[in-house]
């Protein structure tokens, strides 16, 4: 039991700079927890800071990467836990190797009709081991097929689709647009 302790670094920053000691601690944690294959090439990853970033503080990250979200969950309110889990996972994932996939495209010909399906198969999870993709980001895994194979149609659904206009801004997309245009600071976005 450590008593009262800070869990994250200064949060009012837009810097992506990470201290060397924090990168080393993350690399040690990743190697111990997942193995050497999960380390980013060279053992660490650096990201370019935007030209208008306030770089007085380093990036928002866990103070101690070994304090996993599950370790601190009993001491945090649900909202606090969710925020810490996100910060911890993003930080650890940022220092891990990329995920690798095998992309597949299948074209099915039936007389004049042609259907095409794209899928992927994960070869190596990399950073997705700590930060899985959301349901809307997951790819479809196609079954193994051979060229010339005859397929059986189980069902066919006819759908009519229409193009949709661009959606209105959400709070997140508005903040993202303001950041890209260099308008305001992260501390001012909270009031939006």
Model-derived segments and spans:
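Core catalytic DNA strand-manipulation module of type IA topoisomerases
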Residues: 2-192
